[in-house]
Swiss-Prot record:
Disulfide bonds: 94-551, 111-507, 185-250, 344-391, 574-611
Record-given protein name: Envelope glycoprotein B
Principal place of residence: virion
Biological source species: Human cytomegalovirus (strain Towne) (HHV-5)
Keyword Cytoplasm in record: no
Alphabetical keyword list: Disulfide bond, Glycoprotein, Host cell membrane, Host endosome, Host Golgi apparatus, Host membrane, Host-virus interaction, Membrane, Signal, Transmembrane, Transmembrane helix, Viral attachment to host cell, Viral envelope protein, Virion, Virus entry into host cell
Top-level taxon of the source organism: Viruses
Compositional bias ranges of the Polar residues kind: 798-810, 860-877
Amino acid sequence: MESRIWCLVVCVNLCIVCLGAAVSSSSTRGTSATHSHHSSHTTSAAHSRSGSVSQRVTSSQTVSHGVNETIYNTTLKYGDVVGVNTTKYPYRVCSMAQGTDLIRFERNIVCTSMKPINEDLDEGIMVVYKRNIVAHTFKVRVYQKVLTFRRSYAYIHTTYLLGSNTEYVAPPMWEIHHINSHSQCYSSYSRVIAGTVFVAYHRDSYENKTMQLMPDDYSNTHSTRYVTVKDQWHSRGSTWLYRETCNLNCMVTITTARSKYPYHFFATSTGDVVDISPFYNGTNRNASYFGENADKFFIFPNYTIVSDFGRPNSALETHRLVAFLERADSVISWDIQDEKNVTCQLTFWEASERTIRSEAEDSYHFSSAKMTATFLSKKQEVNMSDSALDCVRDEAINKLQQIFNTSYNQTYEKYGNVSVFETTGGLVVFWQGIKQKSLVELERLANRSSLNLTHNRTKRSTDGNNATHLSNMESVHNLVYAQLQFTYDTLRGYINRALAQIAEAWCVDQRRTLEVFKELSKINPSAILSAIYNKPIAARFMGDVLGLASCVTINQTSVKVLRDMNVKESPGRCYSRPVVIFNFANSSYVQYGQLGEDNEILLGNHRTEECQLPSLKIFIAGNSAYEYVDYLFKRMIDLSSISTVDSMIALDIDPLENTDFRVLELYSQKELRSSNVFDLEEIMREFNSYKQRVKYVEDKVVDPLPPYLKGLDDLMSGLGAAGKAVGVAIGAVGGAVASVVEGVATFLKNPFGAFTIILVAIAVVIIIYLIYTRQRRLCMQPLQNLFPYLVSADGTTVTSGNTKDTSLQAPPSYEESVYNSGRKGPGPPSSDASTAAPPYTNEQAYQMLLALVRLDAEQRAQQNGTDSLDGQTGTQDKGQKPNLLDRLRHRKNGYRHLKDSDEEENV
């Protein structure tokens, strides 16, 4: 059964092959006799392909076929053909009878000049104003009284100056008015301390009188001082007495004060700092700062002050508004003025008569070659009616007019009105546009002829959102950023002009290249037009124009490239390009052609040449290439392995865009101020605050003078000159006592003095202890202490008998002592009268006392003589007596006096 099935399959295949061969032979009749048998001469060269061909390759073998199998509808075998590559262009037939679209090459190409960036450039005049950082300067009057107290001590011929004390006090307001109207000051000053009025008089005159002000010898450019006393007075006191005198000097100083924006305080050249705005008038606290004590601040309208304090009977001047600030050490006065009349936030910096304003996307660039700087500003103008511009508006307009009259009046006209812009660095630019008269006339003619443009250029609107107010930002102190911006804009202009020239030259080169394409298209129009449009195009000349048509796309899977390029019926002849077979779409009829460039199929196979041996030909198809050696296919190679001739000059240029340089601050103004160890403003303010605190402390100080001394002083002063002299004497004694007590107290406070006192106290305690022990010993042993010669060195009592025997005897016992001589037995003592001692009479007692006195005198004289004799012979007997070391060594066993040689002989 299975054998029958296989037989049927084989028969069917044979029938199909025979039928296909019959159809093929009938369809190729009359076309070419060589088409039916030239493939029999093809070689069976090995089919090789480069491993690097990774692009899409379409082969006719959609299924696995044997090398000897015949291709459908042909007499060729699969081993006689090579696969194809359709990577870049598909296989197509571009031969046509007539084009459907007509084109021509441009002959009159015009290369216009390139404008790098669409910039609106205006020419004009620029006046630049900077922020005024100079402090506001004005005159200030300072009123003071200087009390100088000097103390001296008068010796017999010399007076010693012990020191001086200077105190600055503020005159009362009633005296200030007298000084301002008469240039005179009173010679006294009174102060209330703890409810008591203290009065100081000039030169201790005890009378209050006026003193005329006069110019001081010391003056400078910013301060003028008027005083009542130039020399300090002091008088010598009485001999051996102290003297303290008072010198009172009135001082009026006209100095300079400075205040910077926003004028919250001002500082004088004398070092005083006032936390009040110099423009505060009592009603404008919202606009002007006030930080002092309101009770000590006074404002007087239409106030009169002498024109010269140093000249008597000087003329009076009326001041509109004068402020007075009363302090503990001075009274400060100044004239109150309107801020807008005496200050200005802006000051003139520079003018540029030739300025170019370029308009960027969000900003204006004002470039001046004279200043070598470019300033950036927003497109919004500053309102011309801004109050901050009131002080410079007229000046700026006049400067612009002067520059225009000097440089442009003959050839230029003003173009628009004056505009104001604020730069990124805080500068203010007044801008006046100008334009040549000839251009203005042309614009006027164009405006008259145009129905839509019937008006000239007018001033930009400064209302609404187009205008802004001047900000309060501070000007930068370094304008390097403006010079950097100018450098960048200059380089940008040069580079953009160079790029414009390059672009224009590129256009000229493209025009010439187009002429070359035109001439080359006469040779192969389809190839030239396909290269230009980057797609397959069929082109043919129709006179002076080109007819274009789309190429006919064929069945890509049916394309086969033959391996052999030899012509069978013509020995020695070879095809100049490989032969291919293909089918049109929706047709199974096999067509023959030759492989053209870029996968184009050339109809027919008549393109032959004489065979040249040896030969090497490579035909490109997509990203691969067919290599034929001696007109036989050898292999497919990767197209990337073959170097290319690159004649393309790439040109990728972009114009430089606008860049607005920002003002960068590495450290802010606050950080720079904080980096300093000393801040003069803060120091002066702190010092001023410290001085203000002193006046509050003075009210709480209690007079340390005792009430009784004050009463005594009043009592002595009431007794006249004699009482005053007695009071001076008492004061001197009291001062001496107070000085001694103060010295003792100071000595005790000293660590060395306290230590000395401790040592003295210890010594006193030791002395008291020694005295106490002596008195105790005297009470216990009166005879031994009062009559030391009665006791020998060994502790025995010396009697009037034989001292040689008794000195060596032991002392008698207590029972055998003389105190018990009346006792006869061991029993208790008897009270018998016979044992009692006989009474002594007064005469006997008196004689006994005299005998004791004589005995004491003799014994003492004898002892003194013995001591002197021992001193003379001490050097001879020094070695026999114990020294200090022996005494210390045997101090525990006691010490007995050793007898010398004289005593031994006597024994």
